[in-house]
Amino acid sequence: MTIEKSVQGGIEILRLSGWLDTQSCPQLEAEISLLGENVCTLVLDCSGLEYISSGGLRLIVAAYKQMKGALMLRHVSDEIMGVIRMTGLDRRLNFE
């Protein structure tokens, strides 16, 4: 997986490409742990995300809790959205 990072004001955007699975979760977890105190919103741009595992979903939920709900998923594919809906997380997470 590759992660491209950009900051716009207090919004940090992480553009994810590839697979978010057990092997790549530590990479995203490390990026999230580096968020500064001045970041008020985290946006995960999923436009390049091809696959997400249960471990990836757990990491997103953990980030949602860390950000106290100020996490937004952007450009989620129909396939990934289907997985999110299957778990019921579509009613908990924020989408753009």
Per-range role (PLM):
Residues L20-R92:
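Amphipathic alpha-helical interaction surfaces in cytosolic regulatory modules
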Residues N94-E96:
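Short acidic-hydrophobic, aromatic-tinged amphipathic segments that line or gate anion-handling sites
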